[in-house]
Amino acid sequence: MSGHSKWATIKRKKDAIDSKRGAIFTRVGKEITVAAKMGGGDPEGNPRLRLAILKAKSVNMPKDNIERAIKKGTGELEGVVYEECLYECFGPAGIAIMVSAVTDKKSRTTPEIKSILTKLGGSLATSGSVSRLFEKKGVIVLESSQIGEDKLVDLAVGEGAEDVINEGEVYRVITTPDDYESVLHALNEKGLKSEESEIRYIALISSEIADKEVAKKVMKLIEQLDGHDDVTSVTSNFELAASLEKEFE
């Protein structure tokens, strides 16, 4: 599970600069619309929609926005037709990157993702060549000021979490996809608020970067991919070498 603290930092900085919460709501809204289109508008009978709604609530998305996104998916409201895309990529120094996107026009999104990769030393990979290096996990990020580590471990692991990682300012709770919902619910019941929560790809093996210039390029690539309007998540197996950590604080 190592190598993700720097990515968490990048993401928090991006979300702060991004402070257009509307951009976050748009991303989550697309996920809700796709989930409702695929499995119907009733979250009780549509686990994927239920999880998308949980994610929306974790970023304080207004109830009206959630309901509109559902209705667009079910056809009750007119809206754009979205489809999911998963891009398997290689970055500088051969790092592996998984990019998830939701788009209304794949023929536009794919060349744009490819262009970002090409400009920063990356490339699209063949199907299966990168995804085999990752697995899907539930990831719940909490500010550490809310609860002590021992208490969180007892609570989260007691509900089925696999791991709790202390990253200083935040804790990262890792679950299986099946246990994600129950763990998140248990944390919410205790009044704990998550900075982010989702089921996403996690690297099985990390790739350490010790060269400062390569590290800069990798981080810029990840930020630009994550900044694309259609991208919903970016995960890489990039890990910053200990010798460079102070350089990027």
UniProtKB/Swiss-Prot annotation:
Transcription regulation recorded as keyword: yes
Localization per record: Cytoplasm
Keyword annotations of the record: Cytoplasm, DNA-binding, Transcription, Transcription regulation
Cellular component aspect of the GO annotation: cytosol
GO molecular function: DNA binding
Record GO biological process: regulation of DNA-templated transcription
One Pfam family this sequence matches: Transcrip_reg
Gene3D superfamilies: 1.10.10.200, 3.30.70.980
Main location: cytoplasm
Similarity comment: family membership: Belongs to the TACO1 family.
NCBIfam families referenced in this protein's UniProt entry, alphabetically: PRK00110.1, PRK12378.1, YebC/PmpR family DNA-binding transcriptional regulator
Name of the protein: Probable transcriptional regulatory protein LBL_2537
Organism listed in the record: Leptospira borgpetersenii serovar Hardjo-bovis (strain L550)
